Amino acid sequence: MWPVFWTVVRTYAPYVTFPVAFVVGAVGYHLEWFIRGKDPQPVEEEKSISERREDRKLDELLGKDHTQVLSLKDKLEFAPKAVLNRNRPEKN
């Protein structure tokens, strides 16, 4: 009798294993939710670093008066000396 049983199980293995795996998975799923309990309260998401940076920059912009800027005539240099005169020792 056992050899016939094992031959049938081996022949129809896909048809046997799927329902068994389904039952084991369903029991495990419900057991996990039973052990875990109720759903935890959703945690309020924190702002990302880039969002906090944007908010900070906007706050800084709101505090400034954008009509008071230096004219181009008042600016003596457009680039720092160190960049333009790096390879010219006679100008240092």
Swiss-Prot record:
Membrane topology listed for this record: Single-pass membrane protein
Main location: membrane
Ranges annotated as spanning the membrane: 15-34
Protein location: Membrane
Record's GO cellular component terms: membrane
Cross-referenced PANTHER family: SMALL INTEGRAL MEMBRANE PROTEIN 12
Family: Belongs to the SMIM12 family.
Record's protein name: Small integral membrane protein 12
Encoding gene per record: SMIM12
